[in-house]
Amino acid sequence: MINNQTLARPYAKAAFEYASAANGSDAWSGMLGLAAAVVEAPEVAELLRNPRLTRESKVEAVLRLFADDVDEAFRNFIANLGEHDRLFVLPTVREQFEAYKAEAEKTIDVELETAYELSAEQLETLAAALSKRLDRSVNPRQVVNPALIGGLVIRAGDLVVDGSVRGKLSQLAESLKS
């Protein structure tokens, strides 16, 4: 069975290539966010699953919800998705589009899980060091988790660095067990 990631990939790639060529990545990002929110709404999701409705009527219903918030190229994109009965993958298309966009702009979202709130200066210093290490512009987001005891856990894409006291204690406990 094909999953949503596989179904969404060609649409996300095509949308990103079109948006990049037209210098409209930010606009398409916004329109995809709107479209994803629309199809995730329970009423719309139910409408899209209704086997009695034709693909064309589903596309018309979704496009009516956008009103004038999307351009003609995006309307055609939605029509193409609907023609192939793929409107339900819009949230995944948006995620993949954002990943392509971040890759092109050399940016990365980084989660910094700390035991205590970091000061603005500490956050800035850490972001600068991570930016240099990852060779990307870093968008840091701090999460406070007192269970870490001290230190921090860094999550950037597939990279996870556990420099927390809790992590070190867990490693020590594992080494003592073996």
Swiss-Prot record:
<dbReference type="GO" id="GO:0005886">
    <property type="term" value="C:plasma membrane"/>
</dbReference>
<keyword id="KW-0813">Transport</keyword>
<keyword id="KW-0472">Membrane</keyword>
<keyword id="KW-0997">Cell inner membrane</keyword>
<keyword id="KW-0066">ATP synthesis</keyword>
<comment type="subunit">
    <text>F-type ATPases have 2 components, F(1) - the catalytic core - and F(0) - the membrane proton channel. F(1) has five subunits: alpha(3), beta(3), gamma(1), delta(1), epsilon(1). F(0) has three main subunits: a(1), b(2) and c(10-14). The alpha and beta chains form an alternating ring which encloses part of the gamma chain. F(1) is attached to F(0) by a central stalk formed by the gamma and epsilon chains, while a peripheral stalk is formed by the delta and b chains.</text>
</comment>
<dbReference type="InterPro" id="IPR026015">
    <property type="entry name" value="ATP_synth_OSCP/delta_N_sf"/>
</dbReference>
<dbReference type="GO" id="GO:0046933">
    <property type="term" value="F:proton-transporting ATP synthase activity, rotational mechanism"/>
</dbReference>
<keyword id="KW-0406">Ion transport</keyword>
<dbReference type="GO" id="GO:0045259">
    <property type="term" value="C:proton-transporting ATP synthase complex"/>
</dbReference>
<dbReference type="InterPro" id="IPR000711">
    <property type="entry name" value="ATPase_OSCP/dsu"/>
</dbReference>
<keyword id="KW-0139">CF(1)</keyword>
<comment type="similarity">
    <text>Belongs to the ATPase delta chain family.</text>
</comment>
<keyword id="KW-1003">Cell membrane</keyword>
<comment type="function">
    <text>This protein is part of the stalk that links CF(0) to CF(1). It either transmits conformational changes from CF(0) to CF(1) or is implicated in proton conduction.</text>
</comment>
<protein>
    <recommendedName>
        <fullName>ATP synthase subunit delta</fullName>
    </recommendedName>
</protein>
<comment type="function">
    <text>F(1)F(0) ATP synthase produces ATP from ADP in the presence of a proton or sodium gradient. F-type ATPases consist of two structural domains, F(1) containing the extramembraneous catalytic core and F(0) containing the membrane proton channel, linked together by a central stalk and a peripheral stalk. During catalysis, ATP synthesis in the catalytic domain of F(1) is coupled via a rotary mechanism of the central stalk subunits to proton translocation.</text>
</comment>
<dbReference type="Pfam" id="PF00213">
    <property type="entry name" value="OSCP"/>
</dbReference>
<keyword id="KW-0375">Hydrogen ion transport</keyword>
